[in-house]
Amino acid sequence: MNRYDELKKHIEENAKLAYDLNYAVAADPELSGCEYRACARYVELCRQMGWPVEENFTKQKTAFRAVVTRPEKAVLKVALMAEYDALPDIGHGCGHSANGAMSFLAAAALSKVKDLPVQIDLIGTPDEELRGGKAVMVKEGVFKDYDLALMIHISSDRTEPNSEVLALSCYRVVFHGQTAHGAHDPWKGRNALNGAMLALHAVDMLRQHVRPETRIGTYIVDGGTASNVVPDRAELECTLRYTSRPYLNEVVEKFMNCIKGAALATETTYEVTPVGLDFDDMVWNKAATEVSASVLTDMGIEYMMPDGSNGSSDVGNVSHQCPALQLYLAAGDTYYPG
């Protein structure tokens, strides 16, 4: 029996566990950093498989690391990454319930392969949609000792042997002013919403002067409470992306100047708070991508190479610490954005 046939056999033997895990997590969505029940399901399954599990991994309450294989003469050390956080309103519309289940299935199948000289860990990486659980792990140096970290991300209609992701920085900006009655004495007020709106106009003008691949998204979180009251507080959320971190840092500096100038012009004050950790762009691993593509070909799965990214993921951070791979696997043949 060759390796593929052996793996196929073990995949089929463990498929129901993975299916049940996927559907259980999908039916019980938990937001980023709050995936307590999902994490507990993974930990229980790992222990049923006989794998030692470290909970609260890197001091993240919904993260874990399970030791899947520890051969005496390992030539490689590989991390399989499992995601399981959901989004507000749409639950597991991004497919993280399936992402994690596929990593578990891969671990379960590989753990049964005889004489496999590879040390394998299954790492539960929560909070991808907000703070970036993998980014936290990178800061702790978790992936320095791995030869490869990989996962599969479900896709609507495209299968790709690897993915490109954009560097991302996200901020909450709060403007503070002075409230006043909008008819009686508005001149006594300092309009925080004016500061926020002027900042948005400045950011819109900035778009002409940044590279075409730059993406800037904004929305008003809080703009006041009544039209006859000068608002003393306004809040924005702003997301900035580019294909590489160094240039994105330049864009962030320009963005901060927009905020600073708007506050100066409206005689308001402001505070800026990062939303989660910075996500980095993906370091493209040619060798791993070629192997991934050859496996897809051997399995008769049609694929396309990435043609530019419009999304971000903390797997990009991982790729700056060790070789990393994130395949996209099509779930259907109709494109859905997101």
What function would you assign to each model-found segment?
Residues 197-338:
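Metal-dependent amide/peptide-bond hydrolase catalytic core
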Residues 76, 145-148, 300:
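Local beta-strand N-terminus motif with an aromatic residue
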Residues 78, 123, 148-150, 323-327:
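Hydrophobic/aromatic beta-strand patches that form the interior of the parallel beta-sheet core
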Residues 28-33, 128, 158, 224-227, ...:
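Short, small-residue-enriched loops and turns at beta-alpha junctions
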